[in-house]
Design a protein with these regions (language model features):
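C-terminal subregions of glycosyltransferases and related glycan-biosynthesis enzymes
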Residues: 1-2, 149, 153, 186, ...
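Conserved nucleotide-sugar donor-binding catalytic segment
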Residues: 139-226
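Glycine-rich, basic loop-to-helix element that forms the pyrophosphate-binding segment
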Residues: 62-78, 88
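Flexible acidic/His/Gly-enriched loops in nucleotide-sugar-dependent glycosyltransferase catalytic domains
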Residues: 64-69, 98-173
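A conserved acidic beta->alpha catalytic loop
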Residues: 39-50, 87
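Short, acidic, metal-binding catalytic loop of nucleotide-sugar glycosyltransferases
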Residues: 23-34
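N-proximal low-complexity "stem/linker" segments adjacent to membrane-targeting elements
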Residues: 1-24
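Short aromatic/hydrophobic "clamp" motif used to bind/position activated sugar donors
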Residues: 83
Length: 330
């Protein structure tokens, strides 16, 4: 039986939204369990630190620069049966912890659960958010060993590998992979998904919108110069691919090849757009994305193939289109 849920909140330099994130956890409705808040940040702030102390939160200061390093510290410091992750600029729906606790309680052996999002504005606070009614659980359990190629395709197309604030994990398992998390700094959402849905794993997808995703300028990149946007995304994508490959090699006996290959293909499609590949190479990747869409589904692969076709004729135009259609990163 689940007795305690730990919420790991990480923050790097940014102070603006942190207390909103913490308050969204403190004001959970009928969680039915003890809640532990673990904040890992790289700054000292009297107001924030005083609030965290008065709230009984575990407040960890670190000089660690990487996201993975902070996440790993939070995992190691947690004492709950389940760990939920939360970025400092996001918030939880008031019923999230209660539903997640119930899901883990009713489905023994789960390692990983992913829930959906509700988009909120930059100005939204924990007490002004118009939350959706998510009391009835919309949840499905999967056994990784029983999934076909097409089923894996559908799962990844549902964005189950997207966004750390949507992820919850069995705490003992999270602690067992903490060192791998520590060594990663990009696409931690995909790393957690890849590890949590490994061989013989039981995992779940929850369609309830339990995470409030704050959409602001630093995320969308719409107000940045196209060249700057391309350069930043190019660096991010290259590092993400490197992280994904390193994780696969480090945990090769426990990772499923299919989701790894599917995620890698999607990243390579992104890279082909950002890196101004020659036409021949772009065409080969475009064909691979299209074949995947035809065989296994996933509208994002169809979209990437169309953008890559456009990229053959105009890299700048394809990047402009890519930037404007991204609500969630592809």
């Amino acid at each position: 039986m689940i007795e305690k849920v730990s919420v790991v909140i990480t923050a790097h330099n940014r102070k603006k939204y942190l207390l909103e994130a913490v308050n969204s956890v403190l004001h959970q409705v009928n969680p039915g369990v003890e809640i532990e808040i673990v904040v890992v940040k790289n700054f000292v702030d009297d107001k924030i630190d005083s609030f965290l102390m008065n709230s009984g939160a575990v407040n960890i200061y670190t000089d660690e620069e990487s996201f993975g390093g902070k996440l790993s510290l939070g995992i190691d410091a947690s004492s709950g049966n389940i760990i939920c992750f939360l970025d400092d600029d996001d918030m939880f729906n008031p019923v999230k912890i209660g539903l997640i606790r119930m899901i883990f309680d009713e489905n023994k052996g789960l390692l990983f659960v992913h829930n959906d999002i509700q988009i909120i504005s930059e100005e939204t606070t924990w007490n002004t958010a118009r939350t959706t009614n998510e009391e009835a659980s919309k949840f499905k359990v999967y056994s990784s060993e029983k999934l076909s190629r097409r089923e894996w395709g559908k799962i990844l197309s549902s964005r189950a590998d997207w966004y750390v604030s949507c992820a919850s994990m069995d705490a003992p398992f999270a602690k067992s992979i903490s060192q791998i998390v520590y060594q990663s700094n990009r696409s931690l959402d995909k790393i957690l998904f890849l590890l949590g849905t490994g061989k013989e794993a039981s995992f779940g997808l929850c369609k309830n919108r339990l995470t409030m995703y704050r959409k602001h300028e630093s995320i969308t990149g719409l107000k940045t110069d196209v060249t700057d946007f391309r350069n930043r995304r190019l660096k991010f994508t290259k590092e993400s691919i490197e992280n994904l490959r390193r994780t696969f090699k480090s945990y090769i006996k426990g990772v499923n090849n299919l989701p790894y290959n599917y995620m890698l293909l999607k990243m390579e499609g992104n890279l082909a757009i950002y890196d101004k590949y020659r036409r021949g190479k772009t065409f080969r990747i475009m064909t691979a994305e299209l074949k995947h869409f035809i065989r296994y589904g996933g509208e994002e692969y169809a979209l990437l193939s169309m953008l890559l076709f456009l990229n053959i004729f105009s890299n700048r135009l394809s990047i402009r289109v890519f930037r404007y259609i991204q609500i969630r990163d592809i």
